[in-house]
Amino acid sequence: MAIYSIKLVDHRNSTSAETAPISASVTRIFGLAFVGTSDSIRVSWGAGNPGDDLVLHFVADIASSYLRQRWPNMTVSPNAGGHTHSHGSLSGTELYRTTPAGAIPLRRYGALAFHEALHNLFPFRSDQHTAMGGGLASANIPDADPNDANKSFLRQGFSVRTHQLL
């Protein structure tokens, strides 16, 4: 029985009125992938550490990118709600509080984080949007729970350790 650690790292001094619903959303959506299995997840806020299976950095917006401190030349779609960048054996993921369209609803972070996790946990693939079952893997992330194919890919991704940008 594996317990996969998902660390949420706040880079914007978020209030508990923001962090609690984000954590609840991430826990619920990721937890759906492990229903009926002997594995589970543990979601917590704090600094990332090498033992974490997935580290998600929360920043104000693209201009406040944490990933660009490590990879200054990476490109991000200007309308993205999050971004994952991998180089060599290292993957980093960040989620944005605001986009040009406005603030992202807190309840949507579970689906957004799940989508970005598929990029993070499969750093050598570039076909996540088309080959991982649609749904939350799609380029335009629906306001929905993960489908069975999404869940299967997430479990597969967690089964192999990907080095995380801390």
Regions found by a protein language model. Give the residues of each.
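Short beta-strand segments enriched in small/hydrophobic residues
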Residues: M1-S14
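Generic structural signal for residues positioned in beta-strands
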Residues: S5, V55, G92-E94, T130-L136, ...
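N-terminal leader/targeting segments
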Residues: I6, L32-G36, A137
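Alpha-helix initiation/capping motif
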Residues: T15, Y96-R97, P142, R161
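Metzincin-family zinc-dependent endopeptidase catalytic domain
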Residues: S16-Q128
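The catalytic-center signature of Zn2+-dependent metalloproteases
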Residues: G102-L166
